[in-house]
Regions:
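Conserved beta-strand/loop positions that form the S-adenosyl-L-methionine
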Residues: 56, 79
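Short alpha-helix immediately C-terminal to the canonical SAM-binding loop
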Residues: 86-88
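Class I SAM-dependent methyltransferase "Motif I" SAM/SAH-binding loop
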Residues: 57-61
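Conserved SAM/SAH-binding beta-strand->alpha-helix loop
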Residues: 82
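S-adenosyl-L-methionine
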Residues: 1-52, 62-69, 90-117
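Short beta-strand element of Class I
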Residues: 74-77
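A short glycine-rich, Lys/Arg-flanked "PGG" loop and its adjoining helix->strand segment in the class I
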Residues: 142-156
Length: 159
């Protein structure tokens, strides 16, 4: 069953500007065949050199918000592809006033294009959709294709 679009979704996303890093990919440009390169400068985004932890599939943001609250010396970036869901996470982060937490909208398959090599200290995959059907296994965040992406952006010895 599809999730119903939240009321005033675009306005709510716009109001989350200070925690919203935007889309990983401009999907319309990608369909037109335009190449995109937007490497994230974490030092510029957060204004410090603290280690970066990445949560892939953050959902409504409960884990990311709590982790950022407990670890103010770590920069957190949470990624979610569902706009209906990530808006709740961003609103919660704004309410908690956490300067060390930002959000990206998009699919995990594009992470490698936007995170520099060896830039993330730890990656979290909490309760991501298991895609139980055999034909959907390539969509699982633990599929070998995704593991290679994570390996590329993780620092040596990263978790």
């Amino acid at each position: 069953m599809r999730m119903r679009r939240k009321k005033y979704l675009d306005e709510r996303l716009d109001a989350c500007g200070n925690v919203n890093l935007g889309w990983l990919v401009d999907y319309a440009a990608e369909q037109r065949g335009e190449t995109q390169q937007r490497t994230l400068d974490v030092r510029e985004i957060f204004g410090n050199d603290n280690p970066v932890h990445l949560e892939v599939g953050c959902g409504k943001g409960g884990f990311a918000v709590e982790a950022a609250r407990r670890n103010p010396d770590i920069n957190f970036i949470a990624v979610e592809m569902a706009r209906n869901v990530i808006v709740s996470a961003m609103e919660l982060a704004i309410k908690e006033n956490l300067p060390n937490l930002k959000f990206l909208m998009g699919k995990a398959e594009y992470l490698e294009k936007f995170f520099p090599e060896n830039s993330v200290e730890r990656i979290y995959l909490n309760f991501s959709c298991p895609y139980p059907k055999e034909t959907y296994k390539k969509h699982r965040l633990t599929h070998p294709v995704f593991l290679e992406i994570y390996k590329h952006i993780l620092i040596p010895g990263g978790e």
